[in-house]
C-alpha cells in the first residue's frame, strides 16, 4: 500500500516551486507539520507503518522504494507521518517492561529503566547518530552540489529509526525468552546464543543503514557504510573465544542504572 497524496505543484515553465509552495516545503514547515500530526492519531496511517515494520525484516529495500515515491509526490525524503515513531515507542515501552520483569525489577526500577531507554538510548542516541550522519553525508558523500542534493536531517533520523527497529525487536523482545534459562546460565551455549543475537541485530542495523543512504541517488561511496561488518565479525569471534557475554553485561548495566 502506498500513500496517494498528489505531486507537489511546480511552475510549468521551469519546474521551480512557487513562493507559496517553497515556504510550505521549508524544513521548519515540515517539522511543524510532523509534530502537529504527532498529537492527532486519526491522521496517522498505522497500517502502513506496520507494513514498513514487517518489510524491514523481510525486504527492507521495499521500504526505501516508498521513500523514493514520497520524494516524487511530496518533495521530501523524510517521513511526514509520525505513525512509525509512535509504534516504535510502544514497542520500546512494552519490551522494556518485559526486561524489568525478566530481571525481577520493582515497579519503580522498571519505570526508571523505561525513562533511560526511551529518552537516552532511543531519542538521545538517535539524535546524536542522525546529526552525525547528516553532517558526514552532506560534507563527504554528496556527489553533486545544490539544494536538491542535500541530505535531509529528518531522513537521517528516519534511517536510524528503520535500522533501530529490528535491533530493538531482536535484543529487547526475542532475547527476553532466552535470558534466564539459556543466556545467563554461565555455559558456552548461553554466550553463543546471546552474542549471536547481538551479531544479527547489529548486522541488521548496519545493513539497513547502508540501504537508507544508498537509496539517495546523489550520494557516493555509500559502500563504506558496510565496512563495520568486518569489525563486527571479528568482535563476535573474539567474544566467543574469550567468553564475553554481551547480554550478561547489558543486564548488569540495566540493573546499575536503576540503583
Curated annotation (Swiss-Prot):
It is found in: Nucleus inner membrane; Golgi apparatus membrane. InterPro entries: UNC-50 (IPR007881). GO terms for biological process: protein localization to cell surface. Residues 1-82, 131-158, 203-222 are cytoplasmic. Belongs to the unc-50 family. GO terms for molecular function: RNA binding. Residues 1-21 are annotated as: Disordered. Residues 1-11 have a biased composition (Polar residues). The keyword Repressor does not apply. The keyword Nucleus applies. This is Protein unc-50 homolog B. Its main location: nucleus. It is a multi-pass membrane protein. The gene is unc50-b. The chain crosses the membrane at residues 83-103, 110-130, 159-179, 182-202, 223-243. Residues 104-109, 180-181, 244-259 are lumenal. One of its GO terms (cellular component) is nuclear inner membrane.
